[in-house]
Amino acid sequence: DVLDFYIMCYPEAEISVCTSTESESMKSFVNCFYAAKVQFFNELYLLCNSMGCNYNVIRDLMLKNKWINPMHTDVPGPDGKLSYGGYCFPKDTNALLQFMKTKNTAHEVLQAVVDERNKMRDDHTNVKLLSAKNKKI
């Protein structure tokens, strides 16, 4: 079976078994967590600038804690801009946000991440999902 194949090919790997829904949820949740982390550190960067502090000094001190992984703490990001860009983070934050709304579950944190990101970037990568109801397409 498939599990035996992966065990044979990757004997040292930890293999997790889950449903496709659980797997897709994990991928989306991780990307949304990283997007929130990027947004949080960008806001700390702006605060440091307003206080006349060196963000990188403070970030490096924070990272000595070892509870905070340094990934996604560089500001500006790899594209030289504030907040998150690329394809996956904007797509996944919007998709999960819309899904949370349809499920009528709490979504204020993710909503704030998306809203604040959109204030920092005007690049239209954070796709707005619009209802096509009553519209001619």
What are these regions (language model features)?
Residues D1-M71, F99-K103:
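Internal alpha-helical scaffold of NAD(P)-dependent oxidoreductase catalytic cores
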Residues D4, N49-I137:
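NAD(P)-dependent Rossmann-like dehydrogenase/reductase catalytic/cofactor-binding core
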